[in-house]
């Protein structure tokens, strides 16, 4: 488990204190994929780099599997960092070294394996990320997605328990992003790695994360399971991210629906309820009529969900709304 206990970070810039992270406490369970989302300057990169002490905290404690990382001396920190892999937005590969040599670098620096053992480990890692045929190529000969796969293989070289991902997909096109996220999900599932990733894209969180923390101005303003936070956002920052990811403009929707009669509600379904014939059943039981104004079905990681915006008229509306609630469907009255 990764635990933050009242951790904060302040920089001294031009004689002034700039707070990048306000006192923060939260925990990440082992084997979890935890996402931090926020706009530029929200403090997410600072928080991520505090975990392996690329940044030094100004106060508080960071505890990993019972060990206080913030109290480690140089030798202890060196040992701890072998348990933490990291991948970066711009790959950080050495241009003069081959793919295999880039992956071997942390093993060579550790000095604990023979050359034959390193070669075997590198071959295993390149096979895992699908680059066995590219071992002798140089970074300049690779696509962006292939470079990031090399970065992932290198990060896994020392068999870490934790993988930190610093905007790992923001420099990639959508198709390549999807393939890299699928690889990270496979690594999490097969190796039981704890993954902490930061991003400014809600779609990245939705595809691979179990839990999410939303950051704004150095504060985690909302935290919870991805399904709860994504489908039922509470903080204005979270709501903006959701609206941006779904390309929703609420003011435009209000204008579009202004002429529509009846009550307007938004229903959110999760799991098997997404496919249940609930609307028809409720309409027959309560006599209401409905018009579908907007809708979508998608997945949050492996969980199907659906959202419908309805105009409801006639019949017993109160009974219909109670029926929706009883069916474990989240209902929001928009008008």
Swiss-Prot record:
Q: Which UniProt keywords apply?
A: Amino-acid transport, ATP-binding, Cell inner membrane, Cell membrane, Membrane, Nucleotide-binding, Translocase, Transport
The entry's localization annotation reads:
Cell inner membrane
Q: What is this protein called?
A: Methionine import ATP-binding protein MetN 1
InterPro entries given in the database record: AAA+_ATPase (IPR003593), ABC_transporter-like_ATP-bd (IPR003439), ABC_transporter-like_CS (IPR017871), ACT-like_dom_sf (IPR045865), MetN_ABC (IPR041701), MetN_ABC_transporter-like (IPR050086), NIL_domain (IPR018449), P-loop_NTPase (IPR027417)
List the source organism.
Answer: Pseudomonas fluorescens (strain Pf0-1)
Q: Does the keyword Cell inner membrane apply?
A: yes
User: Which residues hold ATP?
Assistant: 38-45
GO cellular component, alphabetical, reads:
plasma membrane
Q: Name one GO molecular function term.
A: ABC-type D-methionine transporter activity
Pfam families with a match to the protein in the record: ABC_tran, NIL
Top-level taxon of the source organism: Bacteria
Q: Which reaction does it catalyse?
A: L-methionine(out) + ATP + H2O = L-methionine(in) + ADP + phosphate + H(+); D-methionine(out) + ATP + H2O = D-methionine(in) + ADP + phosphate + H(+)
CDD domains in alphabetical order: ABC_MetN_methionine_transporter
Record Gene3D superfamilies: 3.30.70.260, P-loop containing nucleotide triphosphate hydrolases
Its EC number(s): 7.4.2.11
* Domain ABC transporter stretches: 2-242
Complex formation: The complex is composed of two ATP-binding proteins (MetN), two transmembrane proteins (MetI) and a solute-binding protein (MetQ).
Q: Which gene encodes it?
A: metN1
């Amino acid at each position: 488990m990764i635990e933050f206990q009242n951790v904060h970070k302040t920089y001294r810039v031009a004689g002034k204190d700039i707070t990048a992270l306000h006192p923060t406490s939260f925990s990440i369970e082992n084997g979890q994929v935890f996402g931090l989302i926020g706009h530029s300057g929200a403090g997410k990169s600072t928080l991520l780099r505090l975990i392996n002490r690329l940044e030094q905290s100004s106060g508080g404690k960071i505890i990993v599997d019972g060990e206080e990382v913030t109290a480690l001396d140089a030798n202890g920190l060196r040992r701890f960092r072998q348990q933490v892999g990291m991948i970066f937005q711009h790959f950080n590969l050495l241009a003069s070294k081959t793919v295999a040599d880039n992956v071997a670098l942390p093993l060579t620096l550790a000095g604990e394996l023979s050359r034959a053992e390193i070669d075997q480990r590198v071959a295993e890692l390149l096979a895992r990320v699908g680059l066995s045929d590219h071992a002798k190529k140089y970074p300049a000969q690779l696509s962006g997605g292939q470079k990031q796969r090399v970065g992932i293989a290198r990060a896994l070289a020392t068999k870490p328990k934790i993988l930190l991902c610093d905007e790992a997909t923001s420099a990639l096109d959508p198709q390549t992003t999807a393939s890299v996220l699928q690889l990270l999900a496979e690594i999490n599932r097969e190796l039981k790695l704890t993954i902490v990733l930061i991003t400014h894209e809600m779609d990245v969180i939705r595809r691979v994360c179990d839990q999410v923390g939303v950051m704004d101005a150095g504060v985690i303003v909302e935290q919870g399971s991805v399904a709860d936070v994504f489908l039922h956002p509470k903080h204005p920052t979270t709501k903006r991210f959701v609206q941006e990811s779904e390309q929703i403009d609420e003011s435009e929707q209000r204008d579009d629906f202004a002429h529509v009669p009846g009550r307007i509600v938004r229903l959110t379904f999760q799991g098997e309820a997404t496919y249940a014939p609930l609307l028809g059943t409720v309409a027959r039981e309560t006599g209401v009529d409905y018009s579908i104004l907007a809708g979508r079905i998608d997945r949050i990681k492996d969980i199907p969900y659906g959202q419908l915006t309805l105009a409801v008229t006639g019949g017993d509306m109160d009974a219909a709304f109670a029926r929706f609630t009883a069916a474990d469907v989240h209902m929001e009255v928009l008008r």
